[in-house]
From Swiss-Prot:
Belongs to the bacterial ribosomal protein bL20 family. This is Large ribosomal subunit protein bL20. The keyword rRNA-binding applies. The lineage of its organism: Bacteria, Pseudomonadati, Pseudomonadota, Alphaproteobacteria, Rhodobacterales. HAMAP family: Ribosomal_bL20 (MF_00382). Keywords: Ribonucleoprotein, Ribosomal protein, RNA-binding, rRNA-binding.
Length: 121
């Protein structure tokens, strides 16, 4: 039986890691051993930050909605506005509400008025 050497597989694996490390600084882009560690850590950060991005955007949307609600009525808070939306039966998510607040303030104002009416009733 002939001897099997893993040269092509090893070369392909090294090439894949070094390609992923392209743009890194110093030996992180050229040394396989250091590049492997750098790419592994980068993948850990990427996984963590995909989860964090969802939290960050939700927080941003809430801040934008709160600011827009308070610009329409100083006494109305974000939490009371969301309660008013639920009472009025308006099912618009925070992403769309934040987009309306920024790009179409008059439409957002109409939604605020409906929420206030539901709270008053």
């Amino acid at each position: 039986m002939s001897r099997v050497k893993g040269g092509t597989v090893t070369h392909a694996r090294h090439k894949k890691v070094l390609k992923a490390a392209k743009g890194y600084y110093g030996r992180r882009k050229s040394s396989f051993k250091v590049a492997t560690q750098a790419v592994d850590k980068a993948n850990q950060y990427a996984t963590r930050d995909r989860k964090a991005r969802k939290r960050n955007f939700r927080a941003l949307w809430i801040q934008r909605i709160n600011a827009a609600v308070r610009s329409h009525d100083e006494a109305l808070t974000y939490s009371r506005f969301i309660n008013g939306l639920n009472l009025a039966g308006i099912e618009v998510d925070r992403k769309v509400l934040a987009d309306l607040a920024v790009h179409e303030p008059e439409a957002f104002g109409a939604i605020v008025a409906q929420a206030q009416a539901a709270l008053a009733a």
